[in-house]
A protein has these predicted regions:
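Buried hydrophobic packing segments
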Residues: 30, 34, 38-42
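Hydrophobic beta-strand-centered segment that forms part of the acyl-chain substrate-binding groove
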Residues: 2-5, 25, 39-73, 77-84, ...
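Hydrophobic pocket-lining residues within nucleotide cofactor-binding pockets
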Residues: 19, 55, 113
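Generic structural detector for well-ordered beta-strands
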Residues: 11-14, 59, 109
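A conserved, well-ordered hydrophobic junction motif at loop->secondary-structure transitions
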Residues: 18-33, 163-164
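Short amphipathic
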Residues: 3-16
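HotDog/MaoC-like acyl-thioester-processing domains
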Residues: 8, 65-69, 77-164
Length: 164
């Protein structure tokens, strides 16, 4: 399956109920929107139920204000046996001026599940068509290597007493 086959875009207007006391969208709300957009991509690619396994490298660069749009662009970057990494870029758009600003990028890992057993299942391979997709895929392999190394040292590394 090609990257473009599952890519999605989502638009959300920032309303007062999405905002903090400073009038900008709550970080947790943006994370929720990122998770939703990424889940659509993972579902489209795998055609299976999916669950969120990890969020990586999420930073909030500039705030999105009440009345602005949050534009989310999501695409798959890596497929492993049962897991998929999805990149989500978030922009703000000022509806009065048309100005767009990059506000954040997140990498979200999903696992595809069998609908009956709820166990991880294989997903279709990823067809890379462009040089940009190949470069993003190479970077995704490195992120995956770092995630696995981190998980190994954090969960199965030294005992908790030895870290004190």
């Amino acid at each position: 399956m090609r990257v473009s086959d599952s890519a999605t875009e989502m638009t959300q207007i920032v309303l007062p109920q999405h905002a903090n006391v400073h009038g900008s969208v709550l970080g947790g709300t943006v994370m929720h929107w990122i998770d939703l957009a990424a889940a659509v991509v993972a579902n489209r690619h795998s055609r299976r139920p999916v669950v969120t396994a990890a969020f990586d490298e999420l930073s909030f660069l500039v705030p999105i204000q009440i009345g602005q749009l949050a534009l989310l662009h999501a695409r798959i970057t890596l497929v492993d046996r049962s897991s998929m990494e999805i990149r989500v870029d978030v922009e703000s758009e000022d509806l009065l001026t048309g100005e767009k600003r990059h506000t954040s990028t997140a990498y979200v890992t999903f696992v595809a599940l069998d609908p009956v057993t709820h166990r991880p299942v294989a997903v279709p391979p990823l067809e890379l068509e462009t040089e940009a997709e190949r470069q993003e895929h190479a970077a995704a392999i490195e992120r995956r290597r770092r995630r696995l190394e981190h998980r190994k040292t954090q969960l199965w590394g030294a005992s908790p007493k030895s870290r004190i």
